[in-house]
């Protein structure tokens, strides 16, 4: 979890920017979106396979 201590003479915008950078660096939001709802293993495999096919098709262009 990202933790930000607001420094002396630091604006709230700067502190918020540091917090957002920390959250994105930790991958907190990605983890939240991944666990937002349960995905059955079979569906997860299918999505992963489709993403790989799409990637390969895009790479072949």
From Swiss-Prot:
It comes from the Bacteria. One of its GO terms (biological process) is translation. InterPro entries: Ribosomal_bS21, Ribosomal_bS21_CS, Ribosomal_bS21_sf. Keywords: Ribonucleoprotein, Ribosomal protein. One of its GO terms (cellular component) is ribonucleoprotein complex. GO terms for molecular function: structural constituent of ribosome. The keyword Ribosomal protein applies. Belongs to the bacterial ribosomal protein bS21 family. PANTHER family: MITOCHONDRIAL 28S RIBOSOMAL PROTEIN S21, SMALL RIBOSOMAL SUBUNIT PROTEIN BS21. This is Small ribosomal subunit protein bS21. It comes from Leuconostoc mesenteroides subsp. mesenteroides (strain ATCC 8293 / DSM 20343 / BCRC 11652 / CCM 1803 / JCM 6124 / NCDO 523 / NBRC 100496 / NCIMB 8023 / NCTC 12954 / NRRL B-1118 / 37Y).
